[in-house]
């Protein structure tokens, strides 16, 4: 069998094994071969590469000439003006780019050639070689002179020579190549092309530009090319578009010496008719208007450049530019000088005006200004100017008698005939600016390196008044840098402008706002400029000098939308600096003397097309954005949510940052919530309180009653039901928002952060919103700081801001709500602070006791915990309804402040202390249970409590925390929340105790309120409560008796009232004592709180001063409070004591609720066990006094 099996296996494999093996071997061989092959291939490739490199090196070594052929063709931009770079090599590859640039005339960046300076030879061509440098140039200039003199421009010719030196675009070009990639020349700016026109164009171009004061416009009779004040019509046809833009009449017959360089050379030296024709290819073959339009767009600049050399009638070589692009301006026609194509612009055509010299090099860039696009008749205007020159103009285009060559060069102004221009120029002109670079393109095609516009600018800068460097190079650089392409255009424009400036003739009326002075920009003026433009030091700098005509130009279509014009003239205020990218015309922002008119277009007409990155101005946008951002919170808060005047005033600013969130969610709902239910105002709160009073009565009475009875859970349930139920209407969102955020207020309050969350949750935002709104800052500061982290949970739900603790306390006190409603109604604002605080305290004691004991004390601390657990529903509901309102109210009042204050020390402490302590102590167990529910939430509450405690402790620390938080720390921590809840519960349970304590609490509430009021600003932050505590107690006691009584009465009329009275008396005594110890502070705080009651934000105010000053003083008096009350209100007196102890603490963090519930608890951890005892709080407070958080409490 085995054999069989084996045999079978064999059979299976049978002969197959061999076959398989063979197959496998074959495969392996193949794979191995393949691998080896690959390896060999790689090796060979590598070897070949190395070999190739070696061979190349050897070959080059032996045949250096090969380098040149392989390398870019050397393009000579000869500029007698620019000794540095008479010639520059531009790789042949660059040549096509100019064409591309021409196509993308509008994209300045596209104009910039990629060639590297490396490729630019120092001087490849000898001036004679170019036929422009040296004698030829001189002769050309001489001719030009003659022409000019004939035109009355002989002196200008000399000037043009001088300017050529300064402005010589060739020079600039040659320089620029070194400066930037543009420097490599293929970038043919219309102006640059001509000026730069490879070979001779650069030198010649300057002359041309100078000579070529485009007379296109009748206005601009280009009588003085050098003047460069392109007489361009309103269109401001930059006759000096370096590319001799054929002023293509609609027909488009624009003789354009295409090769700017060649033409320029021709212009500079004897015009080279042959060259011109060749380059003239740029000229539209047919003068058809359509073509003209097309070319116009393409050549807008060119046309502008089209030097309407009417003034040089002598150069009648107008090159009629028969429709067939006769590069008519045969150089011969108008000898070297001024191919100022008058653009004879016969009424119909601007087109033909290719300077004789333009022919070859002048890339009569097709920046053919569509001058005559609409020009037949308008050109007539130009025609007059150009007409004289037009003598020989062929039919299609009036003879474009070339002006002196310089004129041609300067044709950058892409100005169509003034009249035609307005019609067609606007659109095309913008393009023409880019077409200025196209001029380069043409030259590039000829292989001439067109000096970078920036280079040109540099030269021009030299030529132009050096004043421009004064301009904020930064802005200019910013624009230039971002818009290097624009720079090219700018340079072209600048050149044109320069010509204009050089000529000082009227500015072109076209899109050129003024004449640009281009200078080498030494970016030292502006770092930004350097940043923008690495080569800033060499960057051309444009000075745009708006002329009177510029204004006219502004009205016209922008010719240089992409150009940077730096205007020194205030007129440039009209002209706005526009980054092509910036839609906004904000150049005016630049000093009027130096304004960038990037588009060189009137702001109204300017259409920023380009990248925003070019514009520093975009920062303007940013700024607006920032402004909205900074103010949006406030605006939102203010606009979205009605805010009490005080509240809005203070709270808004403070809250706004946070409030927006609150506001957004509850949107000042807290504020709104409070306000919202009743109204955004405190009065609203009062109504709300009233409503709450009803609701609080409802939920307070039921809630309290229930809360007292059901206080913990039942209370919660009832509170929930009641609170929610009655509280729902007004607290509906409050209650609801706070409901989720009920604790949310507190818990959230616990941490505004939490608050944030809970606040976000619901009311938190609401409550927190309110709190935040009013006290958002506070809340954040307080809650956040203190963060009612504990409160956070509860407060978060309920209303962190809600005054987390206070809110909680308040909030927790449905009674507080009632109280609030009552007292708030009574003391709406004041009592809101006070009442809220009081509410927090009294109500807390009362309502809290009921609603919360949890709600109340837990409200803050416990609210965090207690409220959170059972209280979340309960507090959520009750606290929410009432608490939120309360909280809201509280928050609103000093609610937040109170939160700050109360939780800090005052409300809470008072509440906590007296109320809480009694409640706490009592509640410690009961509340704990309750608080535990809450404490269940207590965990989080405990945390919250801790946090809250931190906050609340800090807040309450002195009073509440100390008493309750101290206890609450323990209690809250241990029963911590319980403590809070305890008091709540206790108030519910011990509610009577709590109530008396509530009295105390109320008192404390009052103090809390005071605290809130006072602490609102400071207390809140400082543990305003500490400060507030004394005071709050003081104030609160003062008010508390009313509010507390009312609150107590409304909340827990019987127990609450009794206890409240009792405790209030006690508290009052204590508070008075506190008040005595810090009466002025207390009063001040009280007053402040009252004043700020609506603005919980005051907590922050209180925090620094009160904590430091008030806190110590205010809290010390607390000691005098009877021990019984102290027990109930443990922190009431103990808080005061603690406050004393914490006095150092207040100093610790001024302006914050420094006492950290958690820290306090930590410090008071041992005291937590003592949390029930008032002195625990005292101890705790003292221990924490050093702690910023605790300090706050002490302060309270």
Swiss-Prot record:
A GO biological process held by the record: flagellated sperm motility
UniProt membrane topology term: Single-pass membrane protein
Keyword terms: Membrane, Transmembrane, Transmembrane helix
Biased composition (Low complexity): 212-227, 253-279
Annotated spans, Disordered: 150-345, 367-402, 669-762, 775-806, 826-877, 960-1009, 1168-1196
Biased composition (Basic and acidic residues): 962-971
Positions of transmembrane segments: 27-47
Subcellular location, record wording: Membrane
The keyword RNA-binding appears for this protein: no
One GO CC annotation: membrane
Bias kind Polar residues: ranges: 157-177, 299-321, 733-742, 750-762, 787-804, 826-849
Biased composition (Pro residues): 391-402
UniProt-recorded name of the protein: Uncharacterized protein SPEM3
Organism listed in the record: Homo sapiens (Human)
């Amino acid at each position: 069998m085995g054999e069989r099996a084996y045999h079978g296996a064999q059979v299976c494999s049978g002969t197959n094994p061999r076959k398989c093996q063979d197959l496998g071997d074959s495969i392996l061989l193949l794979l191995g071969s393949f691998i080896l092959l690959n390896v060999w291939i790689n090796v060979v490739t590598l070897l070949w590469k190395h070999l190739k490199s070696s061979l190349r090196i050897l070959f080059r070594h032996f045949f250096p000439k090969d380098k040149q052929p392989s390398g870019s063709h050397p393009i000579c931009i000869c500029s007698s003006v620019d000794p540095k770079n008479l010639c520059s090599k531009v790789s042949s590859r660059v040549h096509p780019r100019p064409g591309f640039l021409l196509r993308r005339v509008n994209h300045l960046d596209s104009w910039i050639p990629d060639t590297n300076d490396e490729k630019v030879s120092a001087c490849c061509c000898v001036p004679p070689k170019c036929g422009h440098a040296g004698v030829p140039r001189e002769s050309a200039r001489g001719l030009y002179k003659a022409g000019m003199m004939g035109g009355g421009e002989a002196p200008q010719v000399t000037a043009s020579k001088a300017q050529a030196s300064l402005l010589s675009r060739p020079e600039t070009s040659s320089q620029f190549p070194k400066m930037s990639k543009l420097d490599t020349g293929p970038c043919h700016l219309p102006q640059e092309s001509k000026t730069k026109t490879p070979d001779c164009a650069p030198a010649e171009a300057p002359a041309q530009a100078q000579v070529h004061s485009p007379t296109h416009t009748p206005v601009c009779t280009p009588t003085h090319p050098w003047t460069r004040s392109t007489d361009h019509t309103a269109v401001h046809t930059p006759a000096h578009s370096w590319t001799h833009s054929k002023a293509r009449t609609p027909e488009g017959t624009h003789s354009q010496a295409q090769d700017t360089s060649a033409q320029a050379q021709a212009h500079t030296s004897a015009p080279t008719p042959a060259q011109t024709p060749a380059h003239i290819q740029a000229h539209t073959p047919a003068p058809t208007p359509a073509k003209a339009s097309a070319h116009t767009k393409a050549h807008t600049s060119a046309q502008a450049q089209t030097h309407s050399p009417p003034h040089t009638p002598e150069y009648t070589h107008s090159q009629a530019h028969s429709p067939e692009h006769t590069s008519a301006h045969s150089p011969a026609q108008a000898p070297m000088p001024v191919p100022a194509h008058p653009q004879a612009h016969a009424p119909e055509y601007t087109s033909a005006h290719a300077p004789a010299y333009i022919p070859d090099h002048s890339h009569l860039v097709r920046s053919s200004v569509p001058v005559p696009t609409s020009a037949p008749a308008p050109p007539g205007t130009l025609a007059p100017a150009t007409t004289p020159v037009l003598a020989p103009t062929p039919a299609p285009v009036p003879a474009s008698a070339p002006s002196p060559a310089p004129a041609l060069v300067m044709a950058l102004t892409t100005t169509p005939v003034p009249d035609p221009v307005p019609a067609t120029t606007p659109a095309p002109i913008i393009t023409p600016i880019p077409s200025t670079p196209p001029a380069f393109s043409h030259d590039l095609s000829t292989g001439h390196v067109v000096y970078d516009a920036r280079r040109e600018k540099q030269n021009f800068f030299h030529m132009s008044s050096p004043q421009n460097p004064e301009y904020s190079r930064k802005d200019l650089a910013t624009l230039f840098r971002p818009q290097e392409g624009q720079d090219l255009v700018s340079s072209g424009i600048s050149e044109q402008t320069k010509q204009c400036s050089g000529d000082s003739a009227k500015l072109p009326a076209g899109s050129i706002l003024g004449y640009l002075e281009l200078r080498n920009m030494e970016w030292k003026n502006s770092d930004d400029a350097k940043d923008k433009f690495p080569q800033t030091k060499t960057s051309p700098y444009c000075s745009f000098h708006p002329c009177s005509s510029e204004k006219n130009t502004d009205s016209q279509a922008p010719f240089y939308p992409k150009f940077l014009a730096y205007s020194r003239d205030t007129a440039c205020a009209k002209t706005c600096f526009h980054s092509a990218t910036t839609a906004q015309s904000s150049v005016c922002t630049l000093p009027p003397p130096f304004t960038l008119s990037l588009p060189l277009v009137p702001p109204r007409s300017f259409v920023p097309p380009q990248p925003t990155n070019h514009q520093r101005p975009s920062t303007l946008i940013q700024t607006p954005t920032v402004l909205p951002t900074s103010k949006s919170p406030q605006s939102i808060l203010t606009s979205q949510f009605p805010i009490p005047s005080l509240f809005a005033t203070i709270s808004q600013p403070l809250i706004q940052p946070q409030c927006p969130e609150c506001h957004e969610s509850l949107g000042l709902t807290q504020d709104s919530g409070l306000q919202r239910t009743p109204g955004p105002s405190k009065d609203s709160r009062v109504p709300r309180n009233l409503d709450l009073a009803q609701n609080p009565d409802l939920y307070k009475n039921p809630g309290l009653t229930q809360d007292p009875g059901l206080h913990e859970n039942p209370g919660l349930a009832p509170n929930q039901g009641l609170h929610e139920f009655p509280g729902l209407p007004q607290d509906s969102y409050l209650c609801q928002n706070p409901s989720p955020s009920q604790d949310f207020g507190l818990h959230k309050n616990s941490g505004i952060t939490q608050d944030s969350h809970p606040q976000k949750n619901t009311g938190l935002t609401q409550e927190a919103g309110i709190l935040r709104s009013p006290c958002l800052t506070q809340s954040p500061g307080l809650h956040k700081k203190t963060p009612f982290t504990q409160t956070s949970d509860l407060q978060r739900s309920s209303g962190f801001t809600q005054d987390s603790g206070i809110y909680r306390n308040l909030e927790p006190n449905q009674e507080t709500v009632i109280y609030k409603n009552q007292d708030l109604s009574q003391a709406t604002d004041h009592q809101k602070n006070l009442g809220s605080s009081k509410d927090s305290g009294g109500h807390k004691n009362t309502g809290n006791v009921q609603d919360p004991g949890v709600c109340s004390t837990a409200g803050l601390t416990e609210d965090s915990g207690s409220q959170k657990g059972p209280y979340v529903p309960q507090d959520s509901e009750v606290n929410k309804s009432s608490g939120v309102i309360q909280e809201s109210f509280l928050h609103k009042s000093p609610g937040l402040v109170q939160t700050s204050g109360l939780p800090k020390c005052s409300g809470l402490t008072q509440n906590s202390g007296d109320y809480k302590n009694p409640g706490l102590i009592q509640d410690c167990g009961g509340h704990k249970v309750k608080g535990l529910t809450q404490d269940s939430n207590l965990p989080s509450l405990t945390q919250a409590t801790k946090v809250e405690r931190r906050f609340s402790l800090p807040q309450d620390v002195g009073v509440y925390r100390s008493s309750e938080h101290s206890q609450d720390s323990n209690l809250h921590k241990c029963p911590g929340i319980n403590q809070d809840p305890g008091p709540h519960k206790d108030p519910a349970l011990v509610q009577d105790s709590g109530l008396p304590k509530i009295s105390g609490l109320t008192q404390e509430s009052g103090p809390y309120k005071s605290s809130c009021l006072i602490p609102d600003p400071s207390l809140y932050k400082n543990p305003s409560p500490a400060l507030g505590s004394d005071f709050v107690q003081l104030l609160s006691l003062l008010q508390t008796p009313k509010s507390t009584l009312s609150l107590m009465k409304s909340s827990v009329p019987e127990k609450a009232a009794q206890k409240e009275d009792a405790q209030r008396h006690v508290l009052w005594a204590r508070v008075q004592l506190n008040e005595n110890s810090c009466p002025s502070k207390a009063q001040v705080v009280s007053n402040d709180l009252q004043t700020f009651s609506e603005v919980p934000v005051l907590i922050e105010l209180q925090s620094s001063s009160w904590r430091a000053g008030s806190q110590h003083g205010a809290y010390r008096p607390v000691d005098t409070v009877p021990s019984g009350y102290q027990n109930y209100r443990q922190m009431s007196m103990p808080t005061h004591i603690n406050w004393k102890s914490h006095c150092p603490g207040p100093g610790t963090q001024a302006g914050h609720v420094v006492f950290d519930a958690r820290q306090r608890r930590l410090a008071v951890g041992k005291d937590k066990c003592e949390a029930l005892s008032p002195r625990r709080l005292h101890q705790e407070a003292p221990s924490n006094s050093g702690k910023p958080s605790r300090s706050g409490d002490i302060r309270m």
